[in-house]
């Protein structure tokens, strides 16, 4: 299929003060020439004076060809097609929002472009028409370009009727729903943290058990927490959830409860690994590690048994 392309949003040009994602194409004496990724790669320029608040010693340390950058629009001449941009005026918070919006808008774009592939569209105008009848309808409805379409598509995974108001024929609707489900159906993630819990007092074992039990009680129906012993005093905490952020938060809360409980008994609590999403590779490595420790413990137990038998024989 020819490389169909279309801008992400209904407006052909960004507005002044919009923070947009660009890709650096070339660097010249006056500044850097870039492509506005959300606006079908139209050209813009970041003047040298707008690259950094500090004195520029090396332009290559500030900006590199091929890299994506979050920049703010400072001037737009729609007739001549000139767009002036600034990197230095973008705050860290604005950059984070820009990246989030770009990621979600790009997901919507990928879904609709794949729909166009399946339906064998051959012209950019056909892809733009699809945007007009789907993504831009929701962007306009919710007054949130980029986010409106993404949120509506995500909602369509559990309730496809949200697409009923769109001007789509049967084939378009079916292919769109299939692609939305393929790209946006939530995937369960496993979250893990490694901790050390110990208490060397008179009731040390009971204190550790009580603290870990308090952590387990932070489980919810949707986010059950498991705690497994790796090797004293190290434990691994895990939970599986569809909500990554909530999962990280629940595990952090459970760790705080365990810390509080064990320290009440003058015990020790250390974080070996902060809560994080783990991959299958991480899980395989953990299983291998626990297996090895089990074998080592079994060997130690075997040595103890042999020593006991020798002692009895001597008696």
From Swiss-Prot:
Asked if the keyword RNA-binding belongs to this entry, the reply reads yes
Residues modified as N6-acetyllysine are 141
Residue stretches of biased makeup (Acidic residues)? 299-308
* InterPro entries per record: NA-bd_OB-fold (IPR012340), S1_domain (IPR003029), S1_IF2_alpha (IPR044126), TIF2_asu_C (IPR024055), TIF2_asu_middle_sf (IPR024054), TIF_2_asu (IPR011488)
Reported effect of changing residue 52 to D? Mimics phosphorylation; promotes relocalization to the mitochondrial surface in response to mitochondrial damage
Which post-translational modifications are recorded for this protein? Phosphorylation at Ser-49 and Ser-52 stabilizes the eIF-2/GDP/eIF2B complex and prevents GDP/GTP exchange reaction, thus impairing the recycling of eIF-2 between successive rounds of initiation and leading to global inhibition of translation, while concomitantly initiating the preferential translation of integrated stress response (ISR)-specific mRNAs. Substrate for at least 4 kinases: EIF2AK1/HRI, EIF2AK2/PKR, EIF2AK3/PERK and EIF2AK4/GCN2. Phosphorylation on Ser-52 by the EIF2AK4/GCN2 protein kinase occurs in response to amino acid starvation and UV irradiation. (Microbial infection) Phosphorylation by vaccinia virus protein E3 and rotavirus A stabilizes the eIF-2/GDP/eIF2B complex and prevents GDP/GTP exchange reaction, thus impairing the recycling of eIF-2 between successive rounds of initiation and leading to global inhibition of translation.
Give the sites modified to Phosphoserine: 49, 52, 158
Q: Which GO terms describe its biological process?
A: cellular response to amino acid starvation; cellular response to heat; cellular response to oxidative stress; cellular response to UV; HRI-mediated signaling; mitophagy; negative regulation of translational initiation in response to stress; PERK-mediated unfolded protein response
Q: Where is this region: Disordered?
A: 293-315
Q: Provide one Gene Ontology cellular component.
A: extracellular exosome
Entry's induction text: Up-regulated upon endoplasmic reticulum stress.
**Family as reported in the entry's similarity comment:** Belongs to the eIF-2-alpha family.
How does the annotation summarize its subunit structure? Eukaryotic translation initiation factor 2 eIF2 is a heterotrimeric complex composed of an alpha (EIF2S1), a beta (EIF2S2) and a gamma (EIF2S3) chain. eIF2 is member of the 43S pre-initiation complex (43S PIC). eIF2 forms a complex with at least CELF1/CUGBP1, CALR, CALR3, EIF2S1, EIF2S2, HSP90B1 and HSPA5. Interaction with METAP2 protects EIF2S1 from inhibitory phosphorylation. Interacts with ABCF1 isoform 2. Associates with ribosomes. Interacts with DDX3X in an RNA-independent manner. Interacts with CDC123.
Describe the function of this protein: Member of the eIF2 complex that functions in the early steps of protein synthesis by forming a ternary complex with GTP and initiator tRNA. This complex binds to a 40S ribosomal subunit, followed by mRNA binding to form a 43S pre-initiation complex (43S PIC). Junction of the 60S ribosomal subunit to form the 80S initiation complex is preceded by hydrolysis of the GTP bound to eIF2 and release of an eIF2-GDP binary complex. In order for eIF2 to recycle and catalyze another round of initiation, the GDP bound to eIF2 must exchange with GTP by way of a reaction catalyzed by eIF2B.
The entry's protein name is Eukaryotic translation initiation factor 2 subunit 1
Look up and give the organism this protein is from: Homo sapiens (Human)
